[in-house]
Structure formats: C-alpha cells, structure tokens
Swiss-Prot record:
Cited PANTHER family: LARGE RIBOSOMAL SUBUNIT PROTEIN UL2M, RIBOSOMAL PROTEIN L2
Pfam families: Ribosomal_L2, Ribosomal_L2_C
Keyword Transmembrane: no
Protein name from the UniProt record: Large ribosomal subunit protein uL2
Keywords: Ribonucleoprotein, Ribosomal protein, RNA-binding, rRNA-binding
Quaternary structure and partners: Part of the 50S ribosomal subunit. Forms a bridge to the 30S subunit in the 70S ribosome.
GO biological process: cytoplasmic translation
Chain's role: One of the primary rRNA binding proteins. Required for association of the 30S and 50S subunits to form the 70S ribosome, for tRNA binding and peptide bond formation. It has been suggested to have peptidyltransferase activity; this is somewhat controversial. Makes several contacts with the 16S rRNA in the 70S ribosome.
Region of interest: Disordered: 38-58, 219-277
Family: Belongs to the universal ribosomal protein uL2 family.
Keyword set includes Acetylation: no
GO molecular function term, any single one: transferase activity
Length: 277
C-alpha cells in the first residue's frame, strides 16, 4: 500500500493524504458476513452522553470477523482483500475447503490465493493461527487471545505486531506493540505475522469534514467553556485555568496523573510496563 497525496486545490486538500487502496481487490463485501450496525452517538440506554466526540458519520454495516480462528485442520484460501470501515486494518475473505466463508484480519504480505490454516499443526507463516505454546520464540504475531477460546483481543490495529519472547510453565512471555511484556496462557491463540495496512498511521486527515464522515465530532477546549461545563471554564477573556494542575471535564487531575487502579488483577501478568511508564 502507498500513500496518495493531493494537490493543494483548496485549503482542505492542502496536505491531505489517503491510501491508494492498491491491496483492495473488491468493493462488494460478502453479504452472509454482514450485520446491521446501530449507531448510538455516544449515548447509553438512558439517552445520556457517556462517550464524547461521537455521532454522525457515514452509515456502515458490520463485518463479522473471525477472531477465534478455531477452524482447525481445514485449509482455506484467500479470495479477496477488502476495506473495512469499522477498523484501521484491512480484512481478507477466506474460502474454506468445506464451503464455509470467514473474514480474518489481513496480515502484511497476504495476497489473493494464499492458503491459511489454524490449529497446533499449522505452519509458521503469515495468516496461520496457532496456540502460543506451538509458536517459536522470536516469532512476530498479532490477534492474541487473553482467554483460551474467547477470540483475539490484543494487537488488532493496522501495522501492529507483538513478539514471543519466551515460555515459562503454562505461560508465554509476549512483548506487545507498546513495549509492555506480558504473561499470557500458552493455550491462547495468536496469528502469525504483522497486521497489514501499516501505512495507516501516516495518513493526514486534512480537514475537519473528513473526521465527521468517520463519525468523529469536534473536541472543544475546556478553557472556552462555562464554569458549569468544565473546571477550566469561566473568567473574563482568555483566563488561566486557575488550578495548580490541568483537570479533566469531571474534575480529575490530568496530563500525567496516573489513573490505573492500584490493585488491578492483571498486574501479576505484566512483567514490564510499557515504554513511557
């Protein structure tokens, strides 16, 4: 995939970049793997705003992705590489030998016609899914489970990857994309390779309207709000925040204040915290 640049024909186009979508082979998704996606606009079941900066955007359909990769021993062949509006990574449609079709995250380097399999006996090549105990030390992986059989939860964004560092008893040491080293049960599955579409982070949105197409609403500074809306609000003109440290909209210290629970159950599985910690 390459980055496409635009000529500065307007202020919005100046500096804008996008993907050239060279890897995408079709714009027609598999209908049997689509599900309706009801947009909530950041509201809960009482209609109250619980997640800011969400709302609007283009209508989407959800693509049902196989994060479990539990179709053991049955080879599949990649039929298409597709764009997914619900995630940064591309997805691949796999046709299995028994006739079933499933979407998987498209790893870097996968192409139409590539054969993928799952299970303890699968080869160590991009797109194959195995239990961590069967993956050699030093292998790059993605789509990692935290509980056996639950489906991949870690390392799913475009361009991300993790690395198997070692094996200790029933756990496997994995270095995540953030630099954190974590112990994960050896029965959990992971997919070989790096997630594709690695140029995604280099894309320049270019204008506010493009964020609105994606369902992202504006972020407003607290200092321009009223006192009842934000701790930084109020005052005459451009007033300072009037506090010894910046605050979140809910009155909690921010910008460097640690928010992780002191007694988090997952602490015992973290061997080394992420790089900036």
């Amino acid at each position: 995939m390459a980055i496409k640049k635009y000529k500065p024909t307007s202020n919005g186009r100046r500096g804008m970049t996008t993907s050239d979508f060279a890897e995408i082979t079709t714009d027609k998704p598999e209908k049997s793997l689509l599900a309706p996606l009801h947009r909530k606009g950041g509201r809960n079941n009482q209609g109250r705003l619980t997640v800011r900066h969400q709302g609007g955007g283009h209508k989407r359909q959800y693509r049902i992705i196989d994060f479990k990769r539990d179709k053991d021993g049955i080879p599949g062949r990649v039929a298409t590489i597709e764009y997914d509006p619900n995630r940064s990574a591309n997805i691949a449609l796999v046709n299995y030998a028994d006739g079933e079709k499933r979407y998987i995250l498209a790893p870097k380097g996968i192409q139409v016609g590539t054969e993928v399999t799952s299970g303890p006996e699968a080869d160590i090549k991009p797109g194959n899914a195995l239990p961590l105990i069967n993956i050699p030390v030093g292998t790059v992986v993605h789509n990692i489970e935290l509980k056996p059989g639950k489906g991949g939860q870690l390392v799913r964004s475009a361009g991300t990857s993790a690395q198997v560092l070692g094996k200790e008893g029933k756990y496997v040491l994995v270095r995540l994309n953030s630099g954190e080293v974590r112990m994960i049960l050896s029965a959990c599955r992971a997919t070989i390779g790096q997630v594709g579409n690695e140029q995604h982070e280099l894309i320049n949105i270019g204008k506010a309207g493009r964020s609105r197409w994606k369902g992202v609403r504006p972020t407003v500074r607290g200092s321009v709000m009223n006192p009842n809306d934000h701790p930084h609000g109020g005052g005459e003109g451009r007033a300072p925040i009037g506090r010894k440290s910046p605050m979140s909209p809910w009155g909690k210290p921010t910008l460097g204040f640690k928010t992780r629970k002191k007694t988090n159950k997952s602490d015992k599985f973290i061997v080394r915290r992420r790089k900036n910690k």
